[in-house]
Amino acid sequence: WTFMDGLHQNIKSYTHSGSKPCKMAATGEAPIGISFAYRGAKEKAAGAPLELIFPSEGLGWEMEAAGILKGTKQLAAAQTLMDWAASEKANQLYNEGYAIVAMPGIAKPVAHFPAEPEKLLIKNDFDWAAQNRDSILTEWQKRYEGKAEAK
């Protein structure tokens, strides 16, 4: 929490959108926006006057997932959707919004984004994050909620 306490002193407001801080910096509404790296690269490629800084500690990331609910009444349709979601075509479409996709060899380089981004990812422990989610959110709200934008 030490890092966040220091950062908090320099935060005007916390948004509920991961890309909004970058968009605000791109339009001049804010001098700095802490955001998804991919959004920053896209804004800069579109001409925004941004200087992108990637943390030397590594890039944060999250995992997208899809699945079929046990007992679904439309199993064949659900399986068709999941087959498509794991297809080469779907991975090509994912690359329009993500620098890294699941299928090797599909992702194209993104302008203004680090080369070989997979090597820059921090280690994520999803089990730990899930087990500690409630306590982390409670502590975050106690410390920082006062600067969060309204939902």
Model-derived regions: residue spans:
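Ligand-binding pocket segment of bilobal, Venus flytrap-like solute-binding proteins
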Residues: W1-E57
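Solvent-exposed, polar/charged alpha-helical surfaces in well-ordered, non-transmembrane soluble domains
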Residues: T2-D5, K23, T27, Q79-D83, ...
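Soluble non-cytosolic domains of exported or imported proteins
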Residues: H16-S19, T72-A76, E88, D127-D134
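Solvent-exposed loop/turn segments at secondary-structure junctions
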Residues: Y38-A41, E57-G60, K73, S87-E88
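A bilobed periplasmic-binding-protein/Venus flytrap-type ligand-binding module shared by bacterial periplasmic
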Residues: E62-Q74, L93-Y94
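Periplasmic-binding protein-like
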Residues: W84-A107
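Short helix/strand-capping connector loops at secondary-structure junctions
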Residues: A111-D125
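Conserved C-terminal helix/tail region of periplasmic/extracytoplasmic solute-binding proteins
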Residues: K123-K151
